[in-house]
Amino acid sequence: MLSALARPASAALRRSFSTSAQNNAKVAVLGASGGIGQPLSLLLKNSPLVSRLTLYDIAHTPGVAADLSHIETKAVVKGYLGPEQLPDCLKGCDVVVIPAGVPRKPGMTRDDLFNTNATIVATLAAACAQHRPEAMICIIANPVNSTIPITAEVFKKHGVYNPSKIFGVTTLDIVRANTFVAELKGLDPARVNVPVIGGHAGKTIIPLISQCTPKVDFPQDQLTALTGRIQEAGTEVVKAKAGAGSATLSMAYAGARFVFSLVDAMNGKEGVVECSFVKSQETECTYFSTPLLLGKKGIEKNLGIGQIPSFEEKMISDAIPELKASIKKGEDFVKTLK
């Protein structure tokens, strides 16, 4: 069933460049001057789905906004600088995307980013909860396994929590899985769809190759190697960039893909499915990524995990302790805030 619903990976991105799409979304990017924020803002500006694009950061946003505003697409772009301008940036937004935070450097795990990024995400989440609680919130800032629980707890503190509208963007894991499977099988990656469930770090990233469309088969040793490559693909990029950052361009692409899918669903398009790290009852973890049917109000239905072989079952049970610890770390962090 999942395979039937899940559309080819890049359909949303391709459609965003067509002229027939509905096109009134007001999108805010918080952290718009950074390595992910700039290319993400470019992709959003290039889409006819977006009518207004507001960019926030603590530096350089007027310049980024001025640069993007010269592009001959209809999205109106405005930059906002510093905390006092954040409420205006959020005003009337339908979708808020948060790539803000520091990137990984060689030798760092996503969890090493926790201390810096937890504070940044909590601060931005509080502003969203106060000034635009109705918006869809898409968190890119790592570690997503902790920053989503942080966002949820901050929204609870403000009495405006809606679990159907807070998304951890794990789309890059799906994009990578699609690409790597396509490479191995000589397929068009735009026609491959691999659900990736669990979390968004190391062994919590669980690609369900058994549910890939089209159906693919690998011998166990190749399957193990492929799974490992998907799980460590972020580290592959960090190493290749040799200290000059982490995955920014592919992450911007994946973030845009998720936003376009969400906006399509908000516009009433049916059958839009994306995986995302959200509040969940699918496993004993309180947050878990699975394929979600998206709708006008966010998550319409959690499609769950479905039938999987023992190899994938074991990956889930191996991931749960680490995932629980990351979730607890995020929740505990919010308890320390005033």
Swiss-Prot record:
Keyword ATP-binding: no
Compartment(s) of residence: Mitochondrion matrix
Gene3D superfamilies reported for this sequence: Lactate dehydrogenase/glycoside hydrolase, family 4, C-terminal, NAD(P)-binding Rossmann-like Domain
Keywords for the protein's UniProt record, in alphabetical order: Acetylation, Glycoprotein, Mitochondrion, NAD, Oxidoreductase, Phosphoprotein, Transit peptide, Tricarboxylic acid cycle
Binding site for substrate: 104, 110, 142, 176
Post-translational modification: Acetylation is enhanced after treatment either with trichostin A (TCA) or with nicotinamide (NAM) with the appearance of tri- and tetraacetylations. Glucose also increases acetylation.
Residues with N6-acetyllysine modification: 78, 91, 165, 185, 215, 239, 296, 301, 314, 324, 328-329, 335
Glycan-bearing residues: 33
One MF annotation (Gene Ontology) recorded for this entry: protein homodimerization activity
Residue(s) carrying N6-succinyllysine: 78, 91, 185, 203, 215, 239, 269, 296, 301, 314, 324, 328, 335
EC nos: 1.1.1.37
A GO cellular component annotation in the UniProt record: mitochondrial matrix
The keyword Acetylation belongs to this UniProt entry's keyword annotation: yes
Activity control mechanisms: Enzyme activity is enhanced by acetylation.
Catalytic activity: (S)-malate + NAD(+) = oxaloacetate + NADH + H(+)
GO biological process, one term: aerobic respiration
Phosphoserine: residues carrying this PTM: 246, 326
Quaternary context: Homodimer.
Entry's family note: Belongs to the LDH/MDH superfamily. MDH type 1 family.
Protein name from the UniProt record: Malate dehydrogenase, mitochondrial
Organism of provenance: Macaca fascicularis (Crab-eating macaque)
